[in-house]
């Protein structure tokens, strides 16, 4: 497998999804084909699981069920879309991957990092990104952005208490420290143009031979 896997991570409201849309025209200049995708989702059945997970009406989904739904969607997505692209030598850039489960379910839901790490490994056969861009923003700022920018489409996780969102951010910050060779932290509190510029700078430095 000689493709490149890049993941984008961060708390809800960090703006990584918007950044991905903004950088796509530039990174599509890379020598390899770019495959942008997202989790949960990316393929038909995984997108259906996404709807179940994020539907605000599904308040009866407990933490363990939530974790396993994410893992099921991840397995489908990896098998059907990510692996074939990587095996074909393409660049897969995914909006959320294994670290989201560690941050949200391991830390945010208090299920424990070891449990989530094991399930991630089981679901992905140990697949890890070559590079993970972590978009960091203060929790209060992130929640304010959510209510301002997507008040009409908040999902079940957006509606969680601020304390859970704080635990998620703290979890991400611990994960970043544990794997400094894989993670690059980007200050997502900056204006969008600066965040986009910083993101492109990291990608061009890390994969200089690919541009």
Swiss-Prot record:
Protein name stated in the entry: Thymidylate kinase
UniProt enzyme class: transferase
Described function: Phosphorylation of dTMP to form dTDP in both de novo and salvage pathways of dTTP synthesis.
Cellular component per GO, a single term: cytosol
UniProt keywords, alphabetically: ATP-binding, Kinase, Nucleotide biosynthesis, Nucleotide-binding, Transferase
Keyword Acetylation on entry: no
Organism field: Lactococcus lactis subsp. lactis (strain IL1403) (Streptococcus lactis)
Family under the similarity heading: Belongs to the thymidylate kinase family.
PROSITE patterns cross-referenced by the UniProt entry: THYMIDYLATE_KINASE (PS01331)
């Amino acid at each position: 497998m000689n493709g490149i896997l890049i993941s984008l991570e961060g708390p809800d409201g960090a703006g990584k999804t918007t950044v991905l849309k903004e950088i796509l025209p530039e990174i599509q200049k890379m020598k390899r084909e770019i495959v942008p995708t997202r989790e949960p989702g990316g393929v038909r059945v995984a997108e259906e699981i996404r709807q179940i997970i994020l539907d605000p009406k599904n308040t009866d989904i407990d933490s363990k069920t939530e974790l396993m739904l994410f893992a099921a969607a991840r397995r489908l997505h990896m098998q059907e879309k990510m692996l074939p692209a990587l095996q074909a030598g393409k660049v897969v850039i995914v909006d959320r991957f294994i670290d989201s489960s560690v941050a949200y379910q391991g830390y945010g839901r208090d299920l424990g990092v070891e449990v989530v790490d094991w399930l991630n490994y089981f679901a992905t056969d140990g697949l890890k990104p070559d590079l993970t861009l972590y978009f960091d923003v203060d929790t209060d700022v992130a929640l304010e952005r959510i209510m301002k920018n997507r008040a009409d489409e908040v999902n079940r996780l957006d509606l969680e208490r601020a304390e859970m969102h704080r635990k998620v951010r703290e979890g991400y910050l611990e994960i970043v420290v544990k794997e400094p060779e894989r993670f690059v932290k980007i200050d997502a509190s900056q204006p969008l143009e600066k965040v986009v510029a910083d993101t492109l700078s990291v990608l061009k430095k890390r994969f200089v031979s690919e541009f």
